Curated annotation (Swiss-Prot):
Membrane-topology annotation of the record: Single-pass type I membrane protein
Comment, domains: In contrast to the related Lilrb4a protein, does not contain any copies of a cytoplasmic motif that is referred to as the immunoreceptor tyrosine-based inhibitor motif (ITIM).
PROSITE patterns: IG_LIKE (PS50835)
Localization annotation: Cell membrane
Subunit structure and binding partners: Monomer and homodimer.
Cellular component, GO, one term: plasma membrane
Biological process annotations from GO: mast cell activation
Name recorded for this polypeptide: Leukocyte immunoglobulin-like receptor subfamily B member 4B
InterPro entries in the record: Ig-like_dom, Ig-like_dom_sf, Ig-like_fold, Ig-like_Receptors_ImmuneReg
Domain Ig-like C2-type intervals: 42-123, 124-212
Pfam families: Ig_2
Gene coding for it: Lilrb4b
Lineage: Eukaryota, Metazoa, Chordata, Craniata, Vertebrata
Cysteine disulfide partners in this protein: 49-98, 144-196
UniProt note on tissues of expression: Expressed on mast cells (at protein level). Also expressed at much lower levels on natural killer cells (at protein level).
């Protein structure tokens, strides 16, 4: 009986963090790597975990490792902490997540973050067909090839878009191992620098050195060049608004002139009617002339 209680107590101590994580209602932490999640071999990287002001300890878990993989206290007056890796090696490559502990219990785990090490193998070569300068809407093919028998290749677009494509490698007799990435109907957002890497299936976070870079330039077709861009559309809208305002001002000005003209004509008609009335009165007065009448005769004869 005592042995059974001891086993149950041991299991409770082991499962306590997991159970608390599932039952907790604390804010979910956020994990990220600096300067990035794809790191060259033997360079340093910092894994950040952002959680809560109430956090007392932060825990970092690594997939397929004894967890917690690392533990840190919060930075002074901060709601986050950092886990330092001074020299990146293949043993640090993998999938990580973090969580924290507060007086209220354990938080849930953050989203998973994949930390990749590059430089473990020789670099593959990258080529593009038909050209690195094409018009929008055209299909192009990137070919990543290597003499190393990689199981998979990954094509990455560097920069703000951060697009990536992964394919299984193709093996043919007397030819390098390769993978062909087809981009149908390329668009301006595909502009940028591309590189590819090779890796083995059993170590998906341990990559080769980067291939040679290829700069892809996508130009617009004639039809697309006639289509206003966002900046062009904004300018077009401003011009259209200005034209409409001008038409409205001209309309109100014309309406004002019409009203003024109408009032002037109405006033002239009123003045003309007054003048006609005065002319008729003058005519009646002029029609009576005392010289045209006989002088009045005297009723009495002189003595």
């Amino acid at each position: 009986m005592i042995a059974m209680l001891t086993v149950l107590l041991y299991l409770a101590l082991i499962l306590e963090p997991r159970t608390a994580v599932q039952a907790g209602h604390l804010p979910k932490p956020i994990i990220w790597a600096e300067p990035g999640s794809v790191i060259a071999a033997y360079t340093s990287v910092i894994i950040w975990c952002w959680g809560s002001w109430e956090a007392q300890y932060y825990y970092l878990d690594k997939e397929k490792s004894v967890n917690p993989w690392d533990t840190e206290v919060p930075l002074e007056n901060r709601n986050k902490t950092k886990f330092k890796i001074r020299f990146m090696t293949a043993s640090y490559a993998g999938i990580y997540n973090c969580y924290y502990k507060s007086a209220a219990g354990f938080s849930e785990h953050s989203d998973a973050m994949e930390l990749v090490m590059t430089g473990a193998y020789e670099n593959p070569s990258l080529s593009v067909y038909p050209s690195s300068n094409v018009t929008s809407g055209v299909s192009i093919s990137f070919k990543c090839s290597s003499s190393t028998l990689f199981g998979r290749f990954i094509l990455i677009q560097e920069g703000k878009h951060g697009l990536s494509w992964t394919l299984d490698s193709q093996h043919q007799a007397n030819q390098p191992t390769h993978a062909t990435f087809v981009l149908d109907a390329v668009a301006p957002n595909h502009n940028g620098t591309f590189r590819c890497y090779g890796f083995f299936r059993n170590e998906p976070q341990v990559w080769s050195k980067p291939s040679n870079s290829l700069d892809l330039m996508i130009s617009e077709t004639k039809e697309q060049s006639c289509t206003p861009t966002e900046d062009g559309l904004e300018t077009y809208q401003k011009i259209l608004i200005g034209v409409l305002v001008s038409f409205l001002l001209l309309f109100f000005l014309l309406l004002f002139l019409i009203l003024i003209g109408y009032q002037c004509r109405h006033k002239n008609k009123a003045n003309a009617s007054v003048k006609n009335t005065q002319s008729e009165d003058n005519a009646e007065l002029n029609s009576w002339n005392p010289q045209n009448e006989d002088p009045p005769r005297e009723l009495c004869t002189p003595r």
